[in-house]
Amino acid sequence: MNEITLFIKSSSANAERRINPQWTVSQLKTKLVPIVGTPEQYQKLTYEPASSTVPGHVFTSEEENLDLGEFKLQPLGTIVVEDTRPPHLRLDFDDLSQVDKYVMPREQYENRTDSVYAWKKRNQLGRFNPDFEASKASRQESLKRELVDLQKNLNSRCCAAGERYGTIRYIGLVPEINNDNLWVGVEFDEPVGKNDGTVSGKRYFNAKNKHGSFLRSSEVEVGDFPPEDILEGL
């Protein structure tokens, strides 16, 4: 019987494999161990066909010795592997904090001649550029001038992309986003924003949930955009 191509999906892996329909469900689980990292006895398999017109299937423990060919698996379908172990017993391959790592002392790293640090230093890039501090100071002065110019729009009505109307409640730096741009905090009339005026736990203005957003000044148009009167026309 010809092999078929199926996708293997789990919380830690996405792969494409050729499956022999003559394998039993138990044999498939054994072959999945090095792919998904879950022992056979803790694997819960679900077949999701590529076509919505074909029914899927959840494999049970009573089907361990049945051939895969009996389930009429279609090419390009997906086998979803769920790890049934308690969370604390699962291996988290994305948690690098659990991996022992060698950390080179800073002084030793800076004395190396084959590092990115040394390369930047030789080529006077970044903070090693003689003009770096001057350029940084110039940028800060530019931001200050831009801030003074924009402050006149504080508490003004505005419109953002998608015909989202609101009021400007904050203009300035938001270090939690970056220190390179000024940000305009908008309180929208409707829940079309991303937050409530806070970023990473720091509050910049007050707004209802999903009524606040931080946008670049180029994304905000200031003008005569009065709040919509929901009673108008009644």
UniProtKB/Swiss-Prot annotation:
InterPro entries: CAP-Gly_dom_sf (IPR036859), CAP-Gly_domain (IPR000938), Ubiquitin-like_dom (IPR000626), Ubiquitin-like_domsf (IPR029071). Its main location: cytoplasm. Residues 174-216 form the CAP-Gly domain. SMART domains: CAP_GLY, UBQ. SUPFAM superfamilies: Cap-Gly domain (SSF74924), Ubiquitin-like (SSF54236). The modification Phosphoserine is found at residue 213. Transmembrane segments: none annotated. One of its GO terms (molecular function) is microtubule plus-end binding. It is found in: Cytoplasm, Cytoskeleton. Residues 4-88 form the Ubiquitin-like domain. One of its GO terms (biological process) is cytoplasmic microtubule organization. The keyword Chaperone applies. Keywords: Chaperone, Cytoplasm, Cytoskeleton, Microtubule, Phosphoprotein. One of its GO terms (cellular component) is nucleus. Belongs to the TBCB family. Required for microtubule function and cell polarity. Involved in the proper folding of alpha-tubulin. Binds to monomeric alpha-tubulin. Interacts with alp21. This is Cell polarity protein alp11. It comes from Schizosaccharomyces pombe (strain 972 / ATCC 24843) (Fission yeast). The lineage of its organism: Eukaryota, Fungi, Dikarya, Ascomycota, Taphrinomycotina.
